[in-house]
């Protein structure tokens, strides 16, 4: 997610300068270093220690969200955290407590909030053209099989964390 989605977005944004990337997969890391002409690290903590970073994007497997985010906060670095915030509520509360203690900025990325279809639904609901809403239903018309870490409950949280985080967030956002 990070190297294929967030890195191009950072590079194409005039307000950001990509200085380094971290990935334990040496092949992916080497490819990213060559493609984006940046420093690369196989260890996120080493990157945070050696680079002068204002912000890190934590797009690691979900079971690393807590330690990577806490590591950034401890080093005085703000965090843009890929959803879900954590695999468990206790971890999310620990992240929030660390954010409050350190005063660092934290943004949990919920990309579907800013998609055009969501904005259109938001405007329609705000217009009250439909009257009082009693139910919102969201369906998936297709599903992809995950064979990587995201499919495993202990690493990615399984389907609920992959898709459910989007659906629950949208319901909260729209209501």
Task: Label the model's feature ranges.
Residues 1-36:
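N-terminal Rossmann-like dinucleotide-binding module
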Residues 37-46:
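Conserved SAM-binding strand-loop segment of SAM-dependent methyltransferases
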Residues 112-175:
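Predominantly a Rossmann-like dinucleotide-binding segment in NAD(P)-dependent oxidoreductases
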Residues 13-14, 50-51, 115:
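Acidic-histidine catalytic/liganding microenvironments
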Residues 55-62, 66-113:
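Beta-strand-loop-alpha-helix segment that lines the small-molecule cofactor/substrate pocket
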Residues 5, 31, 46, 55, ...:
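Alpha-helical elements of Rossmann-like donor-binding domains used by nucleotide-donor carbohydrate transfer enzymes
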Residues 16-20, 54-56, 158-159:
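Short active-site oxyanion
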């Amino acid at each position: 997610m990070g190297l294929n989605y967030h890195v191009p977005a950072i590079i194409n944004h005039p307000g950001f300068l990509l200085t380094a990337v971290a990935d334990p997969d040496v092949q992916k890391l080497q490819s990213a270093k060559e493609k984006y002409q940046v420093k690369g690290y196989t260890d996120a903590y080493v990157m945070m220690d050696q680079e002068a970073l204002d912000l890190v994007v934590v797009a690691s497997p979900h079971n690393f969200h807590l330690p990577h985010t806490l590591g950034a906060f401890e080093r005085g670095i703000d965090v843009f955290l890929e959803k879900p915030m954590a695999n468990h509520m206790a971890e999310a509360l620990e992240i929030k407590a660390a954010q409050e203690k350190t005063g660092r900025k934290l943004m949990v990325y919920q990309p579907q909030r800013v998609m055009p279809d969501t904005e259109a639904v938001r405007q329609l609901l705000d217009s009250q053209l439909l009257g009082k809403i009693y139910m919102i239903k969201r369906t998936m018309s297709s599903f992809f099989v995950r064979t990587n870490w995201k499919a495993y409950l202990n690493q990615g949280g399984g389907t609920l964390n992959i898709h459910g985080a989007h659906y629950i967030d949208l319901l909260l956002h729209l209501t």
